[in-house]
């Protein structure tokens, strides 16, 4: 079955979601009967697999722990024209799935993010204030570094085209995968959009797997790693500038003293200043070399991306 001529696949990463997965599958099938549902179980110790199979979902087991490993497997194993990814905790609004897919197809986008908004009476329970602030800070960090205008970078509710999914390398292992999904779209200058979606509390018996500080720290490290790999000249240029300033602070008094009396009063300091200046020069050179390598990598990823056709919305199957 096809929706607007497209094979749409719902891909659901799961870990111990027996209390929620049945509602997820049924709600999305009700909202879009044409959707093909895949549940990717990540070493659950409860009845997640059995419950998902009982409501007709196709279940795939992923032995490597971590959401990033699951996303990598989902994009590799599922063959579809449009992918809708949603967490298996029944917190996202299934009725918004048509809005995400329609916006993806109508505006020829490669990714649409479902931005979370909560009702005031359940906001504290569903979307904790600390998570909201953390999401805002991390989202703004990515926007400042990589550009774009994302509102909810860490949303687990997204729609992708086939060419996005098949060009995404998925290098992260855990919950920081959402950061990588966002940066991938930005670095390849992909068209993307956002749709506001309702966000609710988990059903009774379902427990969050998120750790505010641990996962926040991992996301920060991912942003740093991506900054170094995607903006190497900026990173190593800043490092080189700092080293050069330190060298000048140490060496300038020695230089003025040498010009005045013809002697170097503190030879070890002079050697240190010269060594730091050499390190600064090497940092600049490394930045230039790695910047060219990054450009070449971006070109190759862009060619892979362009080699996959966009969804043909003009034909009906």
Language-model segments: which ranges?
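The conserved acidic donor/metal-binding loop of glycosyltransferases
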Residues: 87-91
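Short, acidic, metal-binding catalytic loop of nucleotide-sugar glycosyltransferases
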Residues: 26-35
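A conserved acidic beta->alpha catalytic loop
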Residues: 41-49
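Hydrophobic helical membrane-anchoring modules
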Residues: 1-4, 172, 177-317
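Cell-envelope/extracellular polymer assembly enzymes that use nucleotide-activated donors
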Residues: 7-9, 36, 180
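Acceptor/aglycone-binding surface of glycosyltransferases and processive sugar-polymer synthases
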Residues: 62-77, 94-175, 200-217, 222
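N-proximal low-complexity "stem/linker" segments adjacent to membrane-targeting elements
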Residues: 1-27
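Short aromatic/hydrophobic "clamp" motif used to bind/position activated sugar donors
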Residues: 83
């Amino acid at each position: 079955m096809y929706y607007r001529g497209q094979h749409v696949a719902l891909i659901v990463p799961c870990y111990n979601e027996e209390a929620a997965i049945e509602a997820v599958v049924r709600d999305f099938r009700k909202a879009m009967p044409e959707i093909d549902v895949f549940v990717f179980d990540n070493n659950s110790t409860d009845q997640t697999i059995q419950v998902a199979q009982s409501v007709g979902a196709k279940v795939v087991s992923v032995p490597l722990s971590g959401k990033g490993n699951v996303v990598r497997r989902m994009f590799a194993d599922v063959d579809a024209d449009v992918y809708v990814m949603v967490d298996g905790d029944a917190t996202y609004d299934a009725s918004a799935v048509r809005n995400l897919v329609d916006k993806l197809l109508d505006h020829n986008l490669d990714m649409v993010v479902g931005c979370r908004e909560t009702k005031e009476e359940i906001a504290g329970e569903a979307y904790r204030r600390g998570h909201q602030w953390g999401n805002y800070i991390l989202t703004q960090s990515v926007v400042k570094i990589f550009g774009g205008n994302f509102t909810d970078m860490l949303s687990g509710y997204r729609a992708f085209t086939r060419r996005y999914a098949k060009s995404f390398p998925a290098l992260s292992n855990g919950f920081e995968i959402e950061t990588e999904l966002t940066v991938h779209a930005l670095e390849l200058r992909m068209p993307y959009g956002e749709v506001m979606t309702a966000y609710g509390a988990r059903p009774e018996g379902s427990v969050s797997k998120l750790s505010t500080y641990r996962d926040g720290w991992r996301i920060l490290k991912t942003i740093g790693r991506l900054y170094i790999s995607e903006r190497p000249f900026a990173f190593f240029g800043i490092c080189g500038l700092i080293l050069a300033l330190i060298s000048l602070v140490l060496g300038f008094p020695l230089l003025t003293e040498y010009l005045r009396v013809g002697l170097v009063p503190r030879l070890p300091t002079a050697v240190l200043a010269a060594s730091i200046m050499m390190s600064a020069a090497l940092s600049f050179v490394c930045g230039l070399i790695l910047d060219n390598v990054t450009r070449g990598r971006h070109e190759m990823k862009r060619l892979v991306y362009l080699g996959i056709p966009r969804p043909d919305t003009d034909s009906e199957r």
